[in-house]
Amino acid sequence: MKPNDFLKNLLDEASAPFLSGGKFAYHYARGKLSSDSIFREVLKRGLFPAEARFLDLGCGQGSLFAWLLAARKLYEAGNWPQDWPAAPKPLALRGIELMQKDVDRAAQAFGADHPLVRIEQGDMNTADFGQPEVITILDALHYFDYD
């Protein structure tokens, strides 16, 4: 499989859950996942452990989680680049997001009873992080007070 074909398949798979959230949610996910190289590079470089509980601070509508779930699905189906490390296997995907509209879009995309995904409305400056193995903060670091 050509790299561009693989990335298109991954993008299609990761964007699909957001169709239920409307045009904005879907097109936002596609735009974000296709234009921000961090999503591709965390997989290509194997930056996450093989299995992990994730916490994404300022997670928005959960685009990273959709990306990780889609990656694992393609990997398990054998549709994965031979020169890339295995896709990580999420054990739990927890997000903290300040904006309720993003939390609502995530609930539309993943459903209320998703076995791995839980996105809650809250302030990442005061939230209990729990005990995840991986903490990500994409596009939200500037919301942390440096004190």
Protein language model regions, located:
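Class I SAM-dependent methyltransferase Rossmann-like catalytic core
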Residues: L11-R45
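Conserved SAM-binding loop of SAM-dependent methyltransferases across substrates and taxa
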Residues: Q61-P88
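Conserved SAM/SAH-binding beta-strand->alpha-helix loop
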Residues: M99
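Conserved SAM-binding loop
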Residues: A106-A107
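Conserved SAM-binding strand-loop segment of SAM-dependent methyltransferases
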Residues: D113-M124
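A conserved beta-strand element that flanks and buttresses the S-adenosyl-L-methionine
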Residues: T136
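A short, conserved alpha-helix within the catalytic core of class I
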Residues: F144-D147
